[in-house]
A protein has these predicted regions:
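Residue-level signature of outer-membrane beta-barrel architecture
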Residues: 7-9, 118-120, 239, 243, ...
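Predominantly transmembrane beta-strands of Gram-negative outer membrane beta-barrel pores used
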Residues: 1-24, 113-121, 129-133, 240, ...
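Solvent-exposed loop/turn segments connecting transmembrane beta-strands
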Residues: 404, 431-438
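Transmembrane beta-strand segments that form the barrel wall of outer-membrane beta-barrel proteins
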Residues: 1, 423-433
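Membrane-proximal, glycine/serine-rich, low-complexity loop/turn segments characteristic
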Residues: 1-58, 97
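Polar, low-hydrophobicity, Gly/Ser/Thr/Asn/Asp-enriched low-complexity stretches outside signal peptides
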Residues: 1-3, 8-13, 43-45, 61-65, ...
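Membrane-embedded alpha-helical bundles of multi-pass transporters/translocases
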Residues: 6-7, 20, 407, 425-427
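Surface-exposed, low-complexity loop segments enriched in small/polar and acidic residues
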Residues: 26-28, 32-41, 53, 73-109, ...
């Protein structure tokens, strides 16, 4: 929707034009079209995608390098590539996750533009002018569900949620690996003492370690797709005065100020810190309990059970479905990024025709001379977890930035006619920059 209006004032000495525009764009998902619903694959007659899959992919992440060897000496290939089905690990068999359907072809948008332009003649040779422009925009984007994305790289062998089959596959069948299958302790103190004893065995060389070095690629389909809602508001205003000095010279003096406020909200990505805590789980009185809750690191920790109830296809894991919504509230960390920038510009110049000319030239030299000052400041403020890259889908830390500069400039431009067909142009500019760090 767009509206524009305007008219003259004071018997034509002034004029005002205003406008208002509202843009409301509906989202279009890739899954709505045959050509976009399927991630491209290298020639296979199926959808491609990511190996971060709903039942969870687990693969070897350093058994051999750490010094672990299979108890069965006939096993020469240390590598494995599992997924969860029921309470057991089975071969992944190349399963991929088609991430296309939840992604946007077209993002939704809610945008308002408004403003006005005006001028008013003070005298026959001078006028004042002003304009204001306002924009408010919000656009949420959506991409595929979050996941562990390899940020979980080991799981303690005492994990309370391991079935016997899983325990044997990743712990019990390996020489040098410590930790019993799902031990149960009467108190938290006993559980912590047990972990301390395992650390002692590592220290004295009795065992190499007690955490299975396997990497997790689990798609969190039990939660919601990741969303990134970007919003900004901008207001720019300027005032000025311009007119004729005489028949040959004109002037223009103006001042402009602009302010932009920015925000971004990121939802449904998993916290790396909470992922590590929620998978370090031990039995206390028959209840799977986070070690971080026992040692006082995180009293709110909820176990993230990646090992019970793997469903076929893209169904996810039943244990996580059963723990919703509490587990998603704990695991899915929101991030907030705020920012703002401001700019002010002052400019004054004169332009006209001089009394100088090249002999034989068809007209005199024209000139523009002026001064401009600009001040700009910007501040980009990610929250602490964003700066620490505490999101499994982050790809790295988001760096905070802040700073500004100001500049003062003098400029001169000349238009020099030589003949009817030849003109020379010349210009000079002096600029003095200063930053906030000076």
């Amino acid at each position: 929707m767009s509206i524009a209006f305007g008219g003259s004032i004071d018997d034509g000495r002034g004029h005002i034009t205003g406008f208002l525009e509202h843009v409301d764009t509906d989202p279009i998902l890739q899954g709505a079209y045959d050509g976009g619903a399927c991630a491209l694959s290298g020639g296979d007659a199926r959808c491609g995608g990511s190996s971060t899959i709903p039942p969870g992919r687990w693969y070897d992440f350093g058994y051999k390098n750490a010094g672990y060897t299979p108890i069965d000496t006939s096993v020469s290939d240390y590598k494995f590539d599992y997924k969860l089905l029921g309470d057991e690990f089975i071969d992944r068999a190349g399963q991929l996750y088609n991430y296309n359907p939840t992604n946007h072809y077209q993002r939704p948008q809610d945008k308002i533009n408004a403003g006005f332009f005006s001028k008013y003649s003070i005298t026959d040779k001078s006028e004042v002018y002003a304009d204001v422009r306002y924009t408010k925009n919000q656009s949420p984007s959506q991409i595929a569900y979050s996941g562990t994305f390899g940020d979980l790289r080991s799981v303690p062998c005492y994990n309370a949620n391991f079935s016997e089959q899983i325990y044997n596959a990743v712990c019990g069948n390996w020489t040098g690996m410590g930790g019993s299958h799902a031990p149960n302790f009467a108190t938290g103190a006993e559980a912590l003492a047990y972990i301390s004893s395992l650390n002692g065995q590592v220290a004295d060389g009795s065992i190499i370690g007690y955490s299975a070095p396997m990497r997790s690629l689990k798609r969190n389909v039990e939660g919601g797709p990741r969303t990134y809602t970007q919003s900004y508001t901008n207001i720019t205003a300027s005032v000025g005065m311009r007119g004729d000095i005489n028949d040959d010279w004109r002037y223009d003096i103006s001042y402009q100020t602009s302010q932009v406020d920015y925000s971004q909200e990121i939802q449904n990505d998993l916290s790396v810190t909470k992922l590590l805590r929620a998978t370090n789980v031990i039995n206390v009185a028959g209840v799977p309990t986070c070690v971080s809750k026992l040692n006082g690191t995180d009293a709110n920790c909820i176990p993230y059970n990646l090992f019970s109830g793997g469903l076929p296809g893209d169904g996810g894991i039943q244990a996580i479905w059963d723990a919703n919504p509490e587990i998603q509230t704990y695991m899915a960390i929101p991030n907030f990024i705020l920012g703002d920038s401001s700019e002010t510009i002052f400019q004054a110049y004169v332009e006209g025709t001089t009394n100088f000319s090249i002999p034989g030239a068809p007209s005199a030299v024209s000139m523009v001379a002026g001064y401009e000052s600009r001040e700009l400041e910007s501040d980009y403020r990610p929250d602490a977890s964003a700066q620490a890259a505490d999101r499994t889908g982050a790809g790295g830390p988001i760096v905070a930035l802040a700073g500004g500069y100001d500049v003062k400039e003098f400029f001169l431009e000349l238009g020099i006619p030589v003949t009817d067909n030849i003109n020379l142009e010349a210009g000079a500019r002096f600029a003095d920059y200063s930053t906030d760090n000076d």
